[in-house]
Amino acid sequence: MGMTIAEKIIARAAGVDTVKAGDIHTVEVDRLMSNDGTTHLTIDMYNNQLKHPHIADVNKLVWIVDHNVPSDSPKTAASQKKMRDFAREHGIAFYEGQGVCHQIMMEKYVCPGELIFGADSHTCAYGALGAFGTGVGCTDYLYAMVTGKSWVLVPETIRFNLTGRLPEGVYARDLILTIIGKIGANGANYKAMEFVGEGMKTLSMSDRISICNLCVEAGAKTALMEVDDIALDYLRAHGREPKACFSSDPDAVFSAVYDIDLGSIVPIVAKPHFVDNVCPAGEAAGTRIDEAFLGSCNNGRIEDLRVGAALLKGRKVHPLVCFLVVPASQAVYQEAIKEGLIQTFMEAGAIVMNPNCSVCWGSCQGVIGEGETLISTGTRNFKGRAGHRDSFVYLASAATVTASAIKGEIATADML
């Protein structure tokens, strides 16, 4: 019986010839990423709960401060200092203020065929480069950090066969929100979501990252794509060569298969308070907003900023809307400066912030108050996610978010 991409990566990491869904294997973890959201807890466990604390391979560790940058309180500063001091003591690769963790990982570390643990749920983004990325909690992270290994229950795989091309003004963000709405927030619980088909050739790396990144919002254990020339070009442009590129075998077993015509996708919003609560953006048009956010690990790349800046050129942000623009990394920020995008945003009245998680994380920049409404390219719209528990978050593409910031109400680009 053939194997899926997920099964092949696990088999490689486990040092066995074959695995199948439902098996449990001990695996060698190729890389371990953690951010300032929870790393302080890992450090406390390392220092206080281990008889013989040590790190199996410090070269596998990447620590990134991105959730509260710069620190917003003495408590946050102390937590980040703990992280910084530990990294200095042990020689851990450390990034602060350089961008959102998943963007940095994609730019600098992720390679096809790797099995990567991240102390963040959106680690599944790494599947855009054919890596098995999955989020773990502090205990599992610490075990892998100390032993270099962990256990994995081999997931079933849902396959999405993409055909056609997205219409003009429709984006990968609209596609993945459509899929999540179709299968539901629990539709891929502990399963791998695999994307293949001729339609993949029309999707850029930025598109692919956006798709894989949000798969956890359908409950997915991971998301995976085959490594093609587009992925290889991205990898090599960032100074890396592939280690192992996998495709599913013709006789691999899938728990479900969906055929999706990209040409049928329309602009989408996810309404409060669930990511699968989706509707065509036009149905939510006219909903007044107080804030708009263009950024995050899902939609803060240069391609997203280009979309937003193109719509803002010659226009102004609505006077009663706070429009936050947050590049996903310093590399993205610098490119946006070179292309004049930052100037366009500032002339239009947007607030351009340093690269970080910003309001998507909802604990520092741009949090919204009681009764306020945010439209966001962030990852989640749960109650209280972006501030007050009694606020409202709509999720949408960079184009819809920018158009809404201009109009002062939810709108699509063709409504400008």
Named regions from a protein language model:
Residues 1-416:
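Fe-S-dependent hydro-lyases/dehydratases of central metabolism
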